[in-house]
Amino acid sequence: MSDPAYAIQVALVGRLVALATEAGQRVYDDVPSEEQRTSDTGEAWPYISLGNGQMVPVDEECFDRSSTYIDVNVWSRDIGFPQVKRIAGAIRAALHEKELAIAGHVLDRMRVENIAYSRDPDGVTRRARLELLVETQPAI
C-alpha cells in the first residue's frame, strides 16, 4: 500500500494557495513565527495550517484503497468569527465533493466532514477546524 498522505498535502497546499482567500499565501504545515510571517507576506494573520491527520488502509480483495483524514485550520485575530467563517466557507466550497489531482493516486472522494469554530485560550485568536476526508487508491 502506498501512503497518499504526503501527496494529498502537496495537492491541498496548491489548492488552498490558489484560492486567494484573506489568508493569501499564508498556508503552512509548520507555522513560522508571527514576525517571520509578517516579514514574508506583509501580514501575520489570518493564516491556514494543515494539522493532525490519519491514514486508514481500506483493504479490499480487488483493490487497495485509503481513507486519509486531515485537519485544515484557519486562524484569525479579527474580532469575532466572521473572518474564519468566510475563509472556512471558501475552503469548503473548493474542496467538498470536488476533484483534486493527487500525484500517484486516484481520488475516489473528498469531503469536508465537519467544521468546528473555537476561541483560543488566549482570548484573542479564533479558529475554524475543517476535518477533511480524502479517499484514494494508487494510480495504476
Task: Label every PLM stretch briefly.
Residues A18, E22, A93-I140:
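Acidic-leaning, charged glycine-interspersed low-complexity segments
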Residues S76-E97:
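Mid-chain, well-packed structural core segment of small domains
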Residues D59-R65, D120-T125:
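Short, solvent-exposed beta-strand/turn "edge" segments of beta-rich domains on protein surfaces
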Residues M1-E60, K98, I102-A103:
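Small/polar-rich, solvent-exposed N-terminal microdomains that initiate assembly or binding
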Residues D64-D78, R126-Q137:
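Oligomerization/assembly interface segments of phage tail-like spikes and tubes
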Residues M55-V58, R77, Y117-S118:
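Short beta-turn/strand-loop junction motif enriched in small, turn-promoting residues
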Residues P4, I8, Q83, V124:
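Conserved acidic
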